[in-house]
Protein backbone atom coordinates (compact mmCIF):
# COMPACT_ATOMS: atom_id res chain seq x y z
CA UNK A 1 0.00 0.00 0.00
CA UNK A 2 1.38 3.40 -0.99
CA UNK A 3 2.22 5.97 1.63
CA UNK A 4 0.43 8.90 0.02
CA UNK A 5 2.15 11.56 2.11
CA UNK A 6 5.68 10.18 1.70
CA UNK A 7 8.07 11.97 -0.62
CA UNK A 8 10.84 9.68 -1.80
CA UNK A 9 14.07 11.48 -2.68
CA UNK A 10 16.62 9.67 -4.82
CA UNK A 11 20.11 11.13 -4.90
CA UNK A 12 22.12 10.55 -8.06
CA UNK A 13 24.93 13.08 -7.69
CA UNK A 14 25.42 16.07 -9.94
CA UNK A 15 26.78 19.49 -9.07
CA UNK A 16 24.24 19.72 -6.24
CA UNK A 17 26.31 17.37 -4.06
CA UNK A 18 29.83 18.16 -5.22
CA UNK A 19 32.54 19.24 -2.78
CA UNK A 20 35.46 21.53 -3.55
CA UNK A 21 39.04 20.43 -2.90
CA UNK A 22 40.84 23.60 -1.82
CA UNK A 23 44.26 22.05 -2.48
CA UNK A 24 43.86 21.02 -6.12
CA UNK A 25 40.74 22.96 -7.11
CA UNK A 26 38.85 19.83 -8.17
CA UNK A 27 35.21 19.08 -7.50
CA UNK A 28 34.43 15.65 -6.04
CA UNK A 29 31.69 13.67 -4.30
CA UNK A 30 31.58 12.67 -0.64
CA UNK A 31 28.03 12.33 0.72
CA UNK A 32 24.74 14.01 -0.08
CA UNK A 33 23.98 17.32 1.62
CA UNK A 34 20.22 16.81 1.56
CA UNK A 35 19.75 16.04 5.28
CA UNK A 36 21.54 19.29 6.23
CA UNK A 37 19.62 21.32 3.65
CA UNK A 38 16.27 19.98 4.84
CA UNK A 39 17.23 20.67 8.46
CA UNK A 40 18.30 24.24 7.63
CA UNK A 41 15.01 24.75 5.82
CA UNK A 42 13.10 23.41 8.85
CA UNK A 43 11.37 20.96 6.52
CA UNK A 44 8.46 19.15 8.16
CA UNK A 45 7.54 16.88 5.24
CA UNK A 46 7.56 13.09 5.46
CA UNK A 47 10.68 12.38 3.40
CA UNK A 48 12.83 9.31 2.79
CA UNK A 49 16.25 9.92 1.23
CA UNK A 50 18.08 7.16 -0.62
CA UNK A 51 21.38 7.61 -2.42
CA UNK A 52 21.32 5.57 -5.63
CA UNK A 53 24.67 6.80 -6.95
CA UNK A 54 26.99 9.80 -6.87
CA UNK A 55 27.94 10.57 -10.46
CA UNK A 56 28.43 13.59 -12.65
CA UNK A 57 25.53 13.48 -15.09
CA UNK A 58 27.93 13.66 -18.04
CA UNK A 59 29.22 10.27 -16.87
CA UNK A 60 25.76 8.77 -16.28
CA UNK A 61 25.14 5.59 -18.27
CA UNK A 62 22.02 3.86 -19.52
CA UNK A 63 22.61 1.29 -16.75
CA UNK A 64 22.54 4.12 -14.19
CA UNK A 65 19.24 5.31 -15.67
CA UNK A 66 17.85 1.78 -15.40
CA UNK A 67 18.69 1.82 -11.68
CA UNK A 68 16.80 5.10 -11.31
CA UNK A 69 13.80 3.77 -13.25
CA UNK A 70 13.75 0.52 -11.26
CA UNK A 71 13.74 2.41 -7.95
CA UNK A 72 11.01 4.80 -9.10
CA UNK A 73 8.84 1.89 -10.24
CA UNK A 74 9.24 -0.12 -7.03
CA UNK A 75 8.87 2.83 -4.64
CA UNK A 76 5.75 2.85 -2.48
CA UNK A 77 5.75 6.65 -2.64
CA UNK A 78 3.59 8.38 -5.23
CA UNK A 79 5.74 11.51 -5.08
CA UNK A 80 9.37 11.12 -6.10
CA UNK A 81 12.08 13.77 -6.28
CA UNK A 82 15.41 13.00 -7.97
CA UNK A 83 18.49 15.15 -7.52
CA UNK A 84 20.47 14.98 -10.74
CA UNK A 85 23.19 16.76 -12.66
CA UNK A 86 21.79 19.38 -15.01
CA UNK A 87 23.73 18.40 -18.14
CA UNK A 88 21.78 15.18 -18.83
CA UNK A 89 18.73 15.69 -16.62
CA UNK A 90 16.43 15.89 -19.65
CA UNK A 91 17.79 12.58 -21.01
CA UNK A 92 17.05 10.85 -17.70
CA UNK A 93 13.59 12.43 -17.51
CA UNK A 94 12.86 11.09 -21.02
CA UNK A 95 13.99 7.58 -20.02
CA UNK A 96 11.77 7.65 -16.92
CA UNK A 97 8.77 8.92 -18.90
CA UNK A 98 9.24 6.27 -21.58
CA UNK A 99 9.25 3.58 -18.85
CA UNK A 100 5.58 4.53 -18.28
CA UNK A 101 5.61 4.34 -14.49
CA UNK A 102 1.99 4.70 -13.44
CA UNK A 103 0.34 6.85 -10.76
CA UNK A 104 3.45 8.75 -9.70
CA UNK A 105 4.61 12.32 -9.88
CA UNK A 106 8.35 12.31 -10.54
CA UNK A 107 10.40 15.50 -10.55
CA UNK A 108 14.09 16.00 -11.27
CA UNK A 109 16.06 18.95 -9.98
CA UNK A 110 19.66 19.96 -9.55
CA UNK A 111 22.01 22.88 -9.17
CA UNK A 112 24.41 24.87 -11.29
CA UNK A 113 26.47 25.77 -8.20
CA UNK A 114 27.33 23.19 -5.50
CA UNK A 115 25.64 23.41 -2.10
CA UNK A 116 29.13 23.37 -0.58
CA UNK A 117 29.68 26.86 -2.04
CA UNK A 118 27.19 28.23 0.50
CA UNK A 119 24.53 30.83 -0.12
CA UNK A 120 25.61 31.31 -3.75
CA UNK A 121 24.22 27.84 -4.58
CA UNK A 122 20.92 27.67 -6.42
CA UNK A 123 20.44 24.20 -4.92
CA UNK A 124 18.49 25.49 -1.91
CA UNK A 125 15.94 27.24 -4.10
CA UNK A 126 15.65 24.41 -6.63
CA UNK A 127 15.16 21.78 -3.91
CA UNK A 128 12.48 23.84 -2.16
CA UNK A 129 10.71 24.44 -5.46
CA UNK A 130 10.89 20.74 -6.33
CA UNK A 131 9.44 19.74 -2.95
CA UNK A 132 6.50 22.06 -3.54
CA UNK A 133 5.92 21.02 -7.15
CA UNK A 134 6.11 17.27 -6.45
CA UNK A 135 3.16 17.69 -4.07
CA UNK A 136 1.01 19.72 -6.44
CA UNK A 137 1.65 18.59 -10.02
CA UNK A 138 -0.43 15.85 -11.60
CA UNK A 139 1.03 12.43 -12.32
CA UNK A 140 3.91 12.67 -14.79
CA UNK A 141 7.61 13.45 -15.16
CA UNK A 142 8.92 16.99 -14.79
CA UNK A 143 12.10 19.05 -14.61
CA UNK A 144 12.11 21.64 -11.81
CA UNK A 145 14.71 24.39 -12.19
CA UNK A 146 14.93 28.14 -11.67
CA UNK A 147 11.56 28.31 -9.86
CA UNK A 148 9.71 26.75 -12.79
CA UNK A 149 8.40 23.36 -13.75
CA UNK A 150 8.69 21.90 -17.23
CA UNK A 151 7.13 18.79 -18.72
CA UNK A 152 9.93 16.35 -19.52
CA UNK A 153 9.46 16.64 -23.29
CA UNK A 154 9.07 20.41 -23.43
CA UNK A 155 12.33 21.60 -21.91
CA UNK A 156 15.98 22.09 -22.74
CA UNK A 157 18.98 23.47 -20.91
CA UNK A 158 20.38 26.60 -22.51
CA UNK A 159 24.11 25.92 -22.23
CA UNK A 160 24.92 29.58 -22.89
CA UNK A 161 22.83 31.00 -20.03
CA UNK A 162 22.63 27.98 -17.72
CA UNK A 163 18.84 28.31 -17.51
CA UNK A 164 16.23 25.76 -18.49
CA UNK A 165 13.79 26.88 -21.17
CA UNK A 166 10.55 25.80 -22.81
CA UNK A 167 10.68 24.14 -26.21
CA UNK A 168 7.77 23.68 -28.61
Protein language model features and the residues they cover:
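Active-site histidine-anchored catalytic micro-motif
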Residues: 2-168
Amino acid sequence: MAENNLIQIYVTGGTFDKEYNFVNGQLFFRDTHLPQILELGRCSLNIDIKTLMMVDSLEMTDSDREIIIHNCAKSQARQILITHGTDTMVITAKAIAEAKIENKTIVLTGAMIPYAFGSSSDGFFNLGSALSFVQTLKVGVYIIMNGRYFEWNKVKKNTKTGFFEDIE
